[in-house]
């Protein structure tokens, strides 16, 4: 039964994500979704919050560093992919990306911003920018999971506690 549930979960999540090895450096090695509405619906079904990344691609050196160091950290990637529904929005493109920037009142050509959303698309914790390193991001992930009453994995809690504040 566990195997069936795992296979079903993979098929539910797979269509909204892309392979991490196709990622630009700015978005790290996370397997990202691009369909926020699908992620919100899945959030309602699973209880997992949406991890919504607004990122400049191609981006400046700061955006590239965030992707290379934070969003490629294996422990961060594991926590994002197992505890959240990751969706990326390019903050320097038109179309659906532009529509989402406007919906969330996010500026164009800005440094990365991560928002944590419930199944209705509301912020679970207040928006915060200048979260550019592992520990502050891990702390916000812990805060989000606690706010929605989900268990915080020991590995994520350890990452939030042990990482130097700057990395």
Model-derived features: positions:
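C-terminal segment of classical bacterial N-terminal signal peptides
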Residues: 13-19
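Structural micro-motif
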Residues: 48-49, 100-115
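Local sequence-structure signature of Cys/Sec-based thiol-disulfide redox active-site neighborhoods
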Residues: 36-76
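Sec-dependent N-terminal signal peptides
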Residues: 4-13
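N-terminal leader/targeting and pre-domain segments
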Residues: 21-46, 160-162
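Thiol-based oxidoreductase modules, predominantly thioredoxin-like and allied folds used
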Residues: 30-34, 55-56, 69-97
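Solvent-exposed loop/turn segments at secondary-structure junctions
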Residues: 57-60, 91-95, 121-123, 131-132
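Non-catalytic, surface beta->alpha helical segment in thiol-disulfide oxidoreductase systems
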Residues: 69-71, 108-152
């Amino acid at each position: 039964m566990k195997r069936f549930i795992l296979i079903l979960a993979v098929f539910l999540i797979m269509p909204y994500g892309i392979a991490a090895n196709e990622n630009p450096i700015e978005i790290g090695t996370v397997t990202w979704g691009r369909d926020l509405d699908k992620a919100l619906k899945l959030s309602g079904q699973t209880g997992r919050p949406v991890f919504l990344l607004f990122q400049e691609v191609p981006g400046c050196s700061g955006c590239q560093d965030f992707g290379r160091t934070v969003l490629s950290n294996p422990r961060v990637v594991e926590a994002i992919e197992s505890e959240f529904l990751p969706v990326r929005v390019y903050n320097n493109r038109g179309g659906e990306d532009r529509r989402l920037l406007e919906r969330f009142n996010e500026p164009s050509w800005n440094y990365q911003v991560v928002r944590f959303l419930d199944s209705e698309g509301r912020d679970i914790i207040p928006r915060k920018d200048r979260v550019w390193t592992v520990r502050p991001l891990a702390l916000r992930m812990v805060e989000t999971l606690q706010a929605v009453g989900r268990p915080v994995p020991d590995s994520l809690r350890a990452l939030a506690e042990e990482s130097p504040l700057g990395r």
